[in-house]
């Protein structure tokens, strides 16, 4: 595919964006191609990153990873799915749990009731474009409370946005899946 969007190196990015990305690059060991593209809008990218971090603070890791893995899988975003497979393992989740999240949407024996409710909501929102999801939302509110339910809704939107960009740009994972 022709790359319509030039990829920026760290050195080509604004100093503020370089500083913002440095910890992530050090943690991952590489500068992700998503960031190389999105860096053409440095302030928006930094806001996107801040939005992501705020939502990660609002939710426990297991729910964040359920949303990230579920949305990435349903949206066909291998780029993000592989990153979150790796992150989930680093956070201490088992390979079997990660496999269940990505292969058994809305059903499983390793996921907790709140995790299943969150996954069902995420899948329903995407599949139904947000319509007719009151039952799934109610289950999440009953399970984790309305404040966290709002964080889940926002996180779903964040990962859908990422997937749409990655899929349009035809970005591929820069590392292999740790599950193979």
Positions of the model-derived regions?
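Hydrophobic alpha-helical segments
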Residues: 1-180
């Amino acid at each position: 595919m022709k790359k319509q969007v030039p990829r920026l190196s760290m050195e080509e990015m604004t100093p503020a964006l370089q500083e913002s990305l440095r910890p992530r690059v050090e943690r991952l060991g590489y500068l992700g191609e998503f960031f190389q593209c999105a860096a053409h809008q440095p302030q928006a990218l930094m806001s996107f990153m801040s939005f992501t971090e705020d939502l990660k603070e609002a939710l426990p890791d297991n729910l964040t990873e359920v949303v990230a893995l579920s949305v990435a899988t349903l949206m066909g975003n291998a780029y993000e799915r592989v990153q979150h497979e790796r992150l989930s393992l680093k956070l201490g989740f088992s390979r079997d749990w990660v496999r269940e999240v990505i292969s058994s949407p809305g059903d499983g024996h390793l996921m907790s009731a709140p995790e299943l409710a969150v996954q069902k909501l995420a899948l329903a929102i995407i599949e139904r474009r947000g319509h007719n999801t009151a039952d799934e939302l109610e289950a999440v509110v009953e399970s984790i409370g309305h404040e966290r339910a709002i964080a889940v809704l926002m996180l779903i939107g964040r990962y859908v946005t990422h997937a749409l960009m990655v899929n349009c740009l035809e970005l591929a994972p820069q590392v292999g899946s740790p599950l193979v």
